Amino acid sequence: KDISHVVENFKICAGDAQGDFDGTVFGDGDFYKWMESAIYTAYQTDNQLLKEEIENYIDLIGRAQQPDGYLSTKQIIGERSGNGVSRMGDINDFEVYNFGHMFTAACVHKRITGKDSFLAIAARTADYLEHLYEEAERTGEVQTAVCPSHYMGLVEMYRTTGEERYLKLAKQAIALRDSVKNGLDDNQDKIPLKQHEKILGHAVRANYLYAGVADLCLEEEDPDYIKVLHKVWRSLVDKKLYITGGCGALYNGASPYGYFFDHQLVHQAYGYEYQLPNITAYNETCASLGGVFWAYRMFQLEPKAEYFDILERMMLNTNLAALSLDGKRFFYENMLRRAK
């Protein structure tokens, strides 16, 4: 049963079903992450039924995609119904986040199977992004995507295809952050990226950002970016990380770095240095997953045991403990002590 309605959303986009969009705006990305995991599992265990299911889903994704490469089920269904939903109209619709996880899943599929079917879909979406960034540079109208998985996804596209344009696109996407007007601490775009010194704002967004920057540096070294990565990593590990590897003490709060008379809301976020309460800890599971991505890439940049120590702390405590043994239930947040 499609409890999340994710597959049904793709079927509606592909014309296989009728109905309205339902579920979370990041559901497409969750589906792509499931696809990535399923691909690994199917070919490690030689599960023929799962292999067939994967190929059927790739066909569905391809038929849901628009001619220009765009693919976000909420927007496609909304455009057809005329309910006022528009492409790239709200960064909190997670469109580019979803793209990034599609890129990664498609690369895994190509590497394991040798097939181009999923990668061709991802390439068309990357073409759409390329046109989007060209337009942003031309008009100066730039907004930063939340939880920017596409940085890592585009670097993976480069590694998988060898096409330099994907690395260039990842570099362009990261550089465009500095052109955002009225940026926010919560989205890590209030000041230029190369001025970052402290971990702040939404914890998932932050960890995905620095994981993506580290991925870029693995392919094209940038001393300024590497310096930022080391400074912000120390800010996290020395002053804002829970003993369990939990990331982001606050559910809602005010940015500790906001200007007077410019108090900014932060959500699911890092707080003040050493602000690590037990009962009210938020510690979103997704943030620790982002931390694993980041720590792994820091280790590749600089093979020190500390990075894998932190990776294991996050993965074997917060991440592993957040999932039930039967795989059907999970914790979205991970406090250290529950109060009755």
Description of each model-found segment:
Residues K1-K340:
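Glycan-recognition and catalytic cores of secretory/periplasmic carbohydrate-active enzymes
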